[in-house]
């Protein structure tokens, strides 16, 4: 049975904090822009870290370009991470786009549209929401 708060989860949280600081203060690649780290998954042996990111895109910049910039700077970011954290093995960083935010917004819009359509149908039929209950 695994511990409820294992070492890998603690390392994941610390990696997330340090990467957020590094991306904000150290990395100056214009392709990257505004990045939000939504989560970090570290393997049990701490060799790899999959970093889930979302972007606040500005202008013509796309998520693919920003992700390409992050993955190009992964070695430099790993070196800075090694300086910031006291680990015997610094995880190899891999950046992945996190689509949960956009999917959540899409689902929220679908639900809002369905509720609005139901209200217009009720109003058109002359009934109220209390009559339905």
UniProtKB/Swiss-Prot annotation:
InterPro entries in UniProt: KH_dom-like_a/b, RbfA, RbfA_dom_sf, Ribosome-bd_factorA_CS
Principal location class: cytoplasm
UniProt keyword terms in alphabetical order: Cytoplasm, Ribosome biogenesis
This protein's record includes keyword Cytoplasm: yes
GO biological process per UniProt: maturation of SSU-rRNA
This protein's GO CC annotations: cytosol
One function term, GO molecular function aspect: ribosomal small subunit binding
SUPFAM superfamilies registered for this protein in UniProt: Ribosome-binding factor A, RbfA
Pfam families: RBFA
Subcellular location: Cytoplasm
NCBIfam families documented for this protein: rbfA
General function of this protein: One of several proteins that assist in the late maturation steps of the functional core of the 30S ribosomal subunit. Associates with free 30S ribosomal subunits (but not with 30S subunits that are part of 70S ribosomes or polysomes). Required for efficient processing of 16S rRNA. May interact with the 5'-terminal helix region of 16S rRNA.
Family assignment from sequence similarity: Belongs to the RbfA family.
Assembly behavior: Monomer. Binds 30S ribosomal subunits, but not 50S ribosomal subunits or 70S ribosomes.
PANTHER family, alphabetized: RIBOSOME-BINDING FACTOR A, CHLOROPLASTIC-RELATED
Protein name in the entry: Ribosome-binding factor A
Organism whose genome encodes this protein: Psychromonas ingrahamii (strain DSM 17664 / CCUG 51855 / 37)
Lineage: Bacteria, Pseudomonadati, Pseudomonadota, Gammaproteobacteria, Alteromonadales
